[in-house]
């Protein structure tokens, strides 16, 4: 489990900036490799813009430090994307920092049809030796609100899971040769004001 704090402030119809951070439960441990500044942590900021009633834009940045060098992509995507500098001999012993950049956009094609997309880029760096890795991901979603009844939503998602595209140092060979593509369809059915179910495939 992680502990976290998020602060945000909204300027109606214009922008919503926010900042926050998370750290594992070991943040309160005084032992080596733990604590707020010596253990794994995440600091992030985000800015949501609404240039018009039909368009929303989002910018996000996160700075992470992982003391073991694993889970760089939040345990999503390929093994290389999550463990860019790990190997059979050194897994779990390669502390890594990473800068994560994201761009999001959403527009109303009609009152009930929403098209959204986002892309992300991560640059990870080893802290115990030379090594830098580039990781990319993206997704596109289409959602139809009130489809089949008020409060229901039919949605489709297509995208690429986090993929390690380049690497350097003694793990330069750890690069994904193929992309992990993801396709989903779901239907959120509103049973009542307090209950909904979402089957998907």
Locate predicted features:
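Residues on the lipid-exposed face of transmembrane beta-strands in outer-membrane beta-barrel proteins
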Residues: 1, 45-49, 103-107, 140-144, ...
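Aromatic- and glycine-enriched pocket-lining scaffold segments that form the walls
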Residues: 1-48, 181
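Repeated loop/turn-to-beta-strand initiation elements of outer-membrane beta-barrel proteins
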Residues: 2-7, 43, 53-59, 66-68, ...
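Transmembrane beta-barrel strands of outer-membrane/channel proteins
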Residues: 7-11, 59-63, 117-121, 140, ...
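Gram-negative outer-membrane beta-barrel proteins
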Residues: 13-17, 65-71, 84, 123-129, ...
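Hydrophobic, lipid-facing positions within transmembrane beta-strands of outer-membrane proteins
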Residues: 41-45, 99-103, 136-140, 154, ...
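C-terminal hydrophobic structural anchor segments
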Residues: 141-195
């Amino acid at each position: 489990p992680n502990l976290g704090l998020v602060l945000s402030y909204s300027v109606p119809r214009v922008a919503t900036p926010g900042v926050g951070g998370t750290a594992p439960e070991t943040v309160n441990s005084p032992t080596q490799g733990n604590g707020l500044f010596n253990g794994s942590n995440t600091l992030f900021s985000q800015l949501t813009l609404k240039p018009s009633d039909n368009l929303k834009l989002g910018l996000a940045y996160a700075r992470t430090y992982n003391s073991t060098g694993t889970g760089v992509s939040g345990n999503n995507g390929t093994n290389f994307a999550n463990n860019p500098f790990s190997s059979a001999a050194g897994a779990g012993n390669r502390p890594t920092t990473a800068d994560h950049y994201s761009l999001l956009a959403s527009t109303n094609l009609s009152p009930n049809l929403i098209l959204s997309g986002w892309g992300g880029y991560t640059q990870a760096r080893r802290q115990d030796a030379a090594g830098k890795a580039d990781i990319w991901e993206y997704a596109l979603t289409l959602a139809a609100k009130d489809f089949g009844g008020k409060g229901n939503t039919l949605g489709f998602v297509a995208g690429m899971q986090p993929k390690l595209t380049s690497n350097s140092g003694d793990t330069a060979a750890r690069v994904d040769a193929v992309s992990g593509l993801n396709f989903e369809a779901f239907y959120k059915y509103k049973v009542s004001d307090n209950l909904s179910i979402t089957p998907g495939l």
